[in-house]
Amino acid sequence: MRIGMGYDVHKLCENRKLILGGIEIPYELGLLGHSDADVLIHAIMDSLLGAAALGDIGKHFPDTDNKYKGISSMLLLKEVGKLLNENSYEIINIDATIIAQKPKMAPYIKDMIKNIASALCINENQVNIKATTEEGLGFTGEGLGISSQSICLINEK
């Protein structure tokens, strides 16, 4: 068995959609980034790639490549799932946390789990998503950005 850890952070800004776990969340600010800036999916991808010793998302989907500009991170997650399969790994479980002062994530978590499980061709009970705040502390607590952490367990087939 192999374990992987991922982390991502993006700045909140105007005139962008807020996409987390492939879900568009109604909010006056969105995340700034080359792709759709889905910090949850980016952290999950990095944890999976790390567990398989396949590098990180910057290696596979560089922000210097215009073909990834504005791309849905869910499409990239599917590619990561294919990479794991091609390298004879199966996902045991994923556990991730979204760190954001606002908006509240609870109404969207079930749909995020469905999206992630579907993209990776795994069962929903293999994916856990949580959300927390930093009690007004730091850049996420001040509402300047959103971050996410992910840990996963994979196994050779």
Curated annotation (Swiss-Prot):
The record marks 34, 133 as: Transition state stabilizer. A divalent metal cation binds at residues 8, 10, 42. Its EC number is 4.6.1.12. GO terms for molecular function: 2-C-methyl-D-erythritol 2,4-cyclodiphosphate synthase activity; metal ion binding. It is an enzyme of class 4 (lyase). Involved in the biosynthesis of isopentenyl diphosphate (IPP) and dimethylallyl diphosphate (DMAPP), two major building blocks of isoprenoid compounds. Catalyzes the conversion of 4-diphosphocytidyl-2-C-methyl-D-erythritol 2-phosphate (CDP-ME2P) to 2-C-methyl-D-erythritol 2,4-cyclodiphosphate (ME-CPP) with a corresponding release of cytidine 5-monophosphate (CMP). This is 2-C-methyl-D-erythritol 2,4-cyclodiphosphate synthase.
